[in-house]
Amino acid sequence: MKVLIQDDDSGLYLSHQERWTEDPKQARDFAFSIHAASVARKLGLRKFQIYFFFNEIDYKISVFKSGQSEAA
């Protein structure tokens, strides 16, 4: 399982070296949702979601949406 950041405006996932990708399989794994939320805020993202992504079955679950309660 990977922990991903997705920009709500573009629909892209944060990859390595602050690049963005359409493919969640190529996105950076933040390991913990609280770390992902911290990184998203440091980057100044206003509208973002954090997902748990299961690469083996190509499935994702939204666990945090900016503007709502703290990350899981």
Task: Describe these PLM feature segments.
Residues M1-D23:
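Short aromatic-glycine-(Arg/Gly/Cys) micro-motifs in beta-strand/loop hairpins
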Residues Q6, A31, Y51:
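Residues in well-ordered beta-strands of folded domains
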Residues Q6-D8, R28, I57, S69:
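Intrinsic disorder/low-complexity signal
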Residues L14, A27-R28, F52:
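Intrinsic low-complexity, intrinsically disordered segments enriched in polar/basic residues
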Residues W20-F48:
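A short, charged, amphipathic alpha-helix used as a generic interaction element across diverse proteins
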Residues A37-A72:
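Short, mixed-charge low-complexity intrinsically disordered segments
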